[in-house]
Amino acid sequence: MKKQNDFIFGVQYYRAPTPAPQSWASDLKNIKDNGFNTVKFWVQWGWTHRDENEFYFDDMDKLMDLAYENGLKVTLNVIFDVAPVWIFKKYPESKIVLANGSVVEPNAEGHRQIGGFPGTCYNHEKSFEARMEFLKRTVERYKDHPAMHMWDIWNEPEQCGPHRYAKSPELPCFCENCEKKFKEYLEAKYGTIDALNEKWGRCYRNFDDVQMPRDRFTFGDFIDFREFHLDTMTNEANSRIRLAKSIDKNHPVYLHVVPNTSSIFNGLVGVDDFELAKECDVFASTNFATPIWSVLTTSAGKGKTCYNVECHIGSGSTKMHQKQITIKDMAKDLLPQIGMGLRGFMFWQYRPEILGLESPAWGVTKLDGSIGSVGVAAKEFIGKLLPYTDEIANAPAPNPQIAVWKGRKHEIFSYCVNAELQSYAKAVESYVNAAYFNNYNCAVVNDERIIDGLDGVKLLILPMCYEFDSKLAAAVDTFVKNGGTVLCEAHLGGYNADTNRHSYTMPGLGLNELWGIEEEFTTSSYHLKTAVANADDLDTSEFNDDVKKAIDAYGLAGGKCFNIKTSFGFDVLGAERFAALKADDAEVIGTFSKFPCIVKKQHGKGNIIYCGTNLCEAVENDLESFEKFVVKAAEIAGVDRNSAATERGIHLDKVTDNIVIVHNDSDNTVEVALDGNYKALYADCDANGSYAMLPKSAEAFIKA
């Protein structure tokens, strides 16, 4: 495959059956005339593969030719989660089965109007073969077309679209195919039934005895089953990528995810973004303007060209029509994404949808096909940026000195403990935001990245790090000994992922001895008499009956948050968990009621900042102090800010030696220092040494 680092600026155009054929010729001409260089067409399994031996490509043939005639590059997005009718008739056992026994019947949705959604179980072999045949026919047909540019072989992968939110009774998939393959997976992982019994705490006689883990209460079995599904999705992705590459050796092959923020798409019913990115030639995502989306995309796609191939700035529905967009909106949305490492955009979609619940929204144009507010702003945006897009396209993403851990086992463990993922999602995002909006670059790292070493990282943050394993513990210890700083929250390694048992000491996994730090006693913040929030805040609905009875009998003295006095000159809130710490030769930097609960200790060449609470869970109560604490940790670690700007909300990215992007998320006008004389691209004025950034704005500066 030839190396291609194009800056794409395009639109999604065709999701059969819309737009109508009579609009195609004029629309594709107008797409080019309005500044776009790329167009995406959906090739849908159920629309194209209409019978077992019948394929319909007439619409795609015409669209590809029209794109070429208008000088547009084409990405073909191959869509599989709209399975053809004949599949379900021939293989009724291919349907997804939920934990509660419900069968997921094929259906039409607002975003999958042709039906067949969400497709078949990914462990059903015959439907897998049919998917691969459909992909093979598609790639063979268009690999040599002169308009062909890239293959997007999976659109927003997830295990079962109608059930994408983590709820135990609705988790997929428990069909006979999954049960058979899960048992094979366990045998390959554990080798013997005795090894599995030791880990799970069971007494099975053989792997055929294994009962499917339908809920979260004993952790290890549930984590194994969800990881099995994550690996199933990775295998599916790699099969598609490898097949496409084996047929077409000239065009990049990728897929695009909705980044696993844990709030929408997540590790229980989604995919492992880090694993899916590995075999892609480039990597991409559906993206929004908040930092977590771009950071997750470039972190998973580390070292690859990364794109936003579904820009949702024109979102809406029949109930809520889309917003009118200005060039200021466009710059504020897209420029920070470029700063964080994304190298092109495709808008969803060119014409507003007219079929179903997504109508009449999402359009770059108005309903009649004339240019709309999104299109006007997009044309002005790319018109100004175009002379610099080649330079931007080949610029690497920023090199982060802060890394925030997000491990897939630990994400699942967090669900096991909390019966929800929102608290975990907020934990990770809070640390990412604290770095970004205080003018630091950061990345999200998984277990593998930590174990392989964190080149260039000075501060490693471990949010809600209750579950840990020995490989991670050894890697973190090495990182600190070699000069890094780790900021960890309460009960590090309290649950040993190697044994599926709670540790006898915390931190666990021998870190208490290696680091000379011990949690002397622990309790919930809801038992602390001087907590600053009321006990009524506690949701007890997911507690077991015995705990509920005890709470009713004895009551609760505290609340979610409590105040910690720090040696930094400000107080910070802890939340949910409390541990009184004992640490020889350590500096106490935070106390609650005279008990040390945050300590800093040198270890080797580096530092440990050990928190006997979860700071991230108090963010909604005191964001300012939380972020001030993260900044102090960054200073201890020697992390470099991107510029001298220290005002909260200012973020500066030096994309190349000639191009700087500044984002001001604050409510104030801020004078930002620049390292020379620049031109403000969108304000169209000189910026000699400094520039007054307006509130809630972004600007690109080109060196004069």
Q: Residue spans of the language-model regions?
A:
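Polysaccharide-binding and catalytic clefts of secreted carbohydrate-active enzymes
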Residues: 99-282, 286, 295-296
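A short, well-structured beta->alpha microelement
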Residues: 262-264, 434-453
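Short, acidic/polar
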Residues: 18-33, 131-137, 264-276, 326-334, ...
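A conserved amphipathic helix/loop scaffold
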Residues: 326, 463-704
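Hydrophobic targeting/anchoring helices
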Residues: 235, 254-430, 521, 550-552, ...
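The substrate-binding groove and active-site-proximal loops of carbohydrate-active enzymes
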Residues: 9-20, 42-58, 112-132, 171, ...
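Aromatic-lined substrate-binding rim segments of carbohydrate-active enzymes
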Residues: 25-33, 38-106, 136-139, 240-247
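An acidic-aromatic substrate-binding cleft motif
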Residues: 1-22, 30-37
